[in-house]
Design a protein with these regions (language model features):
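Acyl-CoA-dependent O-acyltransferases
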Residues: 1-68, 211-418
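Acyl-thioester-dependent condensation/acyltransferase catalytic cores
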Residues: 48-142, 146, 161
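Small-residue-rich loop/turn and linker elements
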Residues: 57-101, 165-194, 259-290
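Cytochrome P450 heme-thiolate monooxygenase catalytic domain
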Residues: 95-99, 149-155, 314
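Long, hydrophobic, well-ordered secondary-structure blocks that form the structural core
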Residues: 145, 152-163, 173-175
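Short amphipathic alpha-helical face segments that pack within enzyme cores
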Residues: 147-155, 243-248
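Short, charged low-complexity linker/loop segments at the C-terminal edge of domains
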Residues: 161-166, 398-399
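Flexible, P/S/T/G-rich "lid" or insertion loops adjacent to the active sites of thioester-utilizing
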Residues: 178-236
Length: 418
């Protein structure tokens, strides 16, 4: 059954913001949260309150000649509640679920760029046999990135618990770059745009990669990550996160050089620039506030510390290199490790709910905190500093060699990693 929820206090006042061309590239951020209990009436009230301080989500897209705008029009958002008596319980799944047929029935997906489409859709499915509640959220990427999404969901979680949101409040106005902002000294950095393909070609390549690669979800406990970090000479210069990415690249390179005489030479890194460029993206800014940077060539593509330092240097430099696709000798790092979804959106059920998202890509590392699990006594426990890395890898020998190396490293406590 679908109903509609309006802001408890209309605050949009017809305000409009203009979207950047890069905002139109993306579709929606679709997530699933599985809880042992949800009060549906209280959830609806929390959504209504949240919409009042997030009027952009109660808005609609307008097109004015060549401009795309969002008008804060205080429109209702759809809320769907259904009951499922077929599924015995929510299965034990990795954070990133590659099989869309599992997750799609539990998400009411925001449609891409139609004129009268809600920018947020929420669906709750109660599993009658286990009494679990599956909350599916679809958040238009026109609104913002993962940081924007988690900001809204954290506000929603706190309203549900009867708490006030944590400051700062969301900031919606945007600064759009113009021709007058152009810096010709950056033109040499725009070479990656030459590799950009049309949407149809990218979709075709995506389908091809889905058939020639398999998804891997690799988990690391907090103890294992600490051990990896300790192996990096000069570890004070790099973070645990840098070393984790370096380990993934080193492992792939050592196997790839044996199989195909190729290896990854660089990495693209998605970096959130909120509060780095405070004048255009302060803390709390709601937008797609990230840049995609490329590292320099790895001085030693088979060295843990060499790659980790190269990654850290690129992040620290944080210069503009916006791209659309990457080459065969490059990987992409898109990490959510900064955001612990299962702590930010717990609705008061600390370490008792699981978070899932969909889609993995070839040579594209998506990094998340581990979900809580149940111990032998059926109690929920969580390794708060553990990580899951999801990516797609070539089927056959490449995948098998990677898994073999990873499993040996885990069993030997990374004794062969250097």
């Amino acid at each position: 059954m679908t109903s509609h929820i309006i802001p408890c206090s209309p605050t949009g006042n017809g305000h409009r913001i203009e979207l950047a061309g890069t905002d139109l590239i993306f579709e929606s951020i679709d997530n699933i949260f599985v809880y042992p209990l949800l009060d549906i009436d209280r959830l609806k009230q929390a959504i209504s309150r949240a919409l009042s301080i997030w009027p952009i989500l109660a808005g609609r897209v307008l097109i004015n000649e060549d401009q795309y705008l969002i008008e804060f029009s205080d429109q209702p958002i759809p809320f769907t509640y259904i009951e499922n008596d077929q599924l015995e319980y929510w299965p034990n799944l990795p954070v990133v679920v590659d099989d869309m047929t599992i997750c799609k029935p539990f998400i009411d997906v925001v449609q891409y760029k139609p004129m009268d489409e809600s920018l947020l859709r929420i669906k709750v499915t109660r599993l009658l046999r286990s009494n679990e509640y599956v909350l599916g959220t679809s958040f238009s990427h026109l609104i913002g990135d993962a940081a924007s999404n988690i900001h809204f969901l954290n506000d929603l979680s706190r309203f549900y618990q009867g708490l006030e949101p944590i400051l700062p409040r969301p900031i919606f106005d945007r600064y759009l770059w113009t021709k007058d902002d152009a810096d010709v000294s950056l033109l040499s950095n725009l070479k990656p745009y030459q590799n950009a393909d049309k949407r149809e070609i990218i979709a075709t390549n995506f389908v091809r990669d889905q058939t020639t690669t398999d998804q891997l979800n690799i988990s690391f406990s907090s103890i294992q990550l600490e051990k990896l970090h300790s192996l990096a000479d000069g570890k004070d210069e790099v973070t645990v996160h840098d070393v984790l990415n370096a380990y993934m690249i080193v492992t792939m390179n050592k196997n790839s050089i044996e199989i195909s005489n190729e290896y990854f030479q660089r990495a693209y890194i998605l970096v959130n620039y909120r509060n780095l460029l405070h004048s255009i993206a302060p803390t709390g800014h709601v937008a797609n506030s990230f840049v995609i940077m490329i590292t320099s060539d790895f001085p030693n593509p088979f060295s843990l510390i060499s790659i980790a330092k190269t990654i850290r240097q690129a992040i620290n430099k944080c210069h503009d290199k916006l791209i659309c696709v990457w080459d065969t000798n490059e990987v992409v790092i898109n990490s959510n490790f900064k955001y612990d979804w299962s702590n930010q959106v717990d609705f008061g059920m600390i370490n008792q709910f699981r978070f899932h998202t969909i889609t993995s890509l070839k040579s594209y590392f998506r990094i998340f905190h581990l979900n809580p699990i149940k111990d032998q006594e059926d109690h929920w426990i969580k390794d708060n500093n553990g990580a899951e890395v999801s990516f797609r890898i070539q089927k056959g020998e490449m995948k098998n060699k990677f898994l073999e190396t990873y499993q040996q490293d885990i069993e030997t406590n990374f004794i062969n990693v250097e």
